[in-house]
Amino acid sequence: MFPFGPHSPGGDETAGAEEPPPLGGPAAASRPPSPAPRPASPQRGADAASPPPVAGSPRLPGGPAVSPAERAGEFAAPGALELSAATASASQAKLSPSSSPRRRSRPDWRAGGRSRQGLGAGLGGPGARLFGWLRERSLGRGLFVDPARDNFRTMTNLYGSIHPADSVYLSTRTHGAVFNLEYSPDGSVLTVACEQTEVLLFDPISSKHIKTLSEAHEDCVNNIRFLDNRLFATCSDDTTIALWDLRKLNTKVCTLHGHTSWVKNIEYDTNTRLLVTSGFDGNVIIWDTNRCTEDGCPHKKFFHTRFLMRMRLTPDCSKMLISTSSGYLLILHELDLTKSLEVGSYPILRARRTTSSSDLTTTSSSSGSRVSGSPCHHNDSNSTEKHMSRASQREGVSPRNSLEVLTPEVPGERDRGNCITSLQLHPKGWATLLRCSSNTDDQEWTCVYEFQEGAPVRPVSPRCSLRLTHYIEEANVGRGYIKELCFSPDGRMISSPHGYGIRLLGFDKQCSELVDCLPKEASPLRVIRSLYSHNDVVLTTKFSPTHCQIASGCLSGRVSLYQPKF
């Protein structure tokens, strides 16, 4: 270590008259001294000005390509990063053969706090890159934050390169229309719900047929839901739900009876292991799979509403969303599946029409808020609002299973009613995806609604829980059939049935995440890729949870698998 200079805070005037010889053995020690005369040492207390930099000062042989000032800025402690340009120039002059050796001045360590302000901006090279990387990491971005997220980003880019000619067809055409597709959580099995009472199982990687569950039900199979990597449930128009085990597909695990009409979809709460089903009888039924036997599972009716179409749980199971054919979207906040909701037992937080701007129109009365919308909605609204709980009138209270009644705004349908036929949720719970059709079946729309922050706490609030952010008009074909659309596993893309094929939609051209490109007003979804390979109307589509693959099924029974070719 070099001794302190005579004018450093702890230096001695007599100490360090000359620097020690450089390391490197006798050859380095025998180096002749510089011919330049040694300048006189300044007086104590005088300001010693550094000499101007020596132009064209050569580097030491075999030394690094960077200057000493850059090395000091890269490796020194934070307090030493404020070495002045004159000090760096003096170091260069010292290393020059034509310059005389000088004492190295000690940096002011008390200036470390001031130097930190310019760490990222004042320095170039590795220092700026380092602090730029730290900043991106603190914001949750970059390659080292979430590898799975960046893998999905790569997969999103690959989806844009898929061509219809790359599709693979699965042999399902003898089993009727395809109503639903579902991958196992590990992506190893693809299940197909068919119109003619059967369920087909395929290996999505090799496209080979695994098993056909003949007469899985006595009527159309509508929906399939995996509970884990081996157990899955199916529901049917025969009003039953069946549980299956991939390890033993010869027989059902059990059959569940409880609905009185067509059962349309299945949800599963992984926290409580409760199965949730809904049907056209208007009932939402809870099944306790923890106490399942060959005769069935204990069950109870959880909720009832008229014109029920679809029911979904958010990924954290804190909300339940229910869509109706009369254009309403019901949201149960602070969900508690252990408590049955009889008519009149749940508080209604508000009944409003969602919008993408601030021109919300509501009228309130002493009995609660009333929806301002199409006249065809009033009967359903009156039957719901007349049972409003007084508990929700207290400001600041958001009780368990609080009901919110919304009329989602649909572009072009402001003055007409609409039917919400399909309902999906963002994988991270940020938004809900709806497929809406007009009551006259002359228009179809795909709409994305962002969840607003915070749960509603008052019966009438100036802000709804949902806000329309993106939309796109769909092909008005296959009237009377429900088209099931879906999010990609990372939520960056949407796969939507469109005529005889599917469209991959994004929130912007770069397939950014929703939170990174939220518009101030509702804007159209961007078409990333259109894939048309069917000869009939496509009814359902699904992303693989683990591979870069999309499946679609059509009315004539064909299943297509899309994946990029390398």
From Swiss-Prot:
One GO term of the cellular component aspect?
Cul4-RING E3 ubiquitin ligase complex
GO BP field: protein ubiquitination
Residue segments, region Disordered: 1-72, 87-123, 354-413
Annotated InterPro entries:
DCA10, WD40/YVTN_repeat-like_dom_sf, WD40_repeat_dom_sf, WD40_rpt
Q: Does the keyword NAD apply?
A: no
Q: Give the pathway annotation.
A: Protein modification; protein ubiquitination
Q: Where is this chain compositionally biased, Low complexity type?
A: 87-100, 354-374
Phosphoserine is found on S50, S57, S67, S96, S99, S100, S356
Pfam families noted in UniProt? WD40 (PF00400)
The WD repeats lie at: 173-212, 216-254, 258-297, 303-342, 415-455, 477-515, 533-566
On this chain, the residues bearing Omega-N-methylarginine are R141
Q: Which UniProt keywords apply?
A: Methylation, Phosphoprotein, Repeat, Ubl conjugation pathway, WD repeat
Where does the record place Basic and acidic residues bias?
A: 377-388
What the entry lists under SMART domains is as follows: WD40
Q: What does this protein do?
A: May function as a substrate receptor for CUL4-DDB1 E3 ubiquitin-protein ligase complex.
Assembly description: Interacts with DDB1.
As for family, the record states: Belongs to the WD repeat DCAF10 family.
Q: What is this protein called?
A: DDB1- and CUL4-associated factor 10
Q: Which gene encodes it?
A: Dcaf10
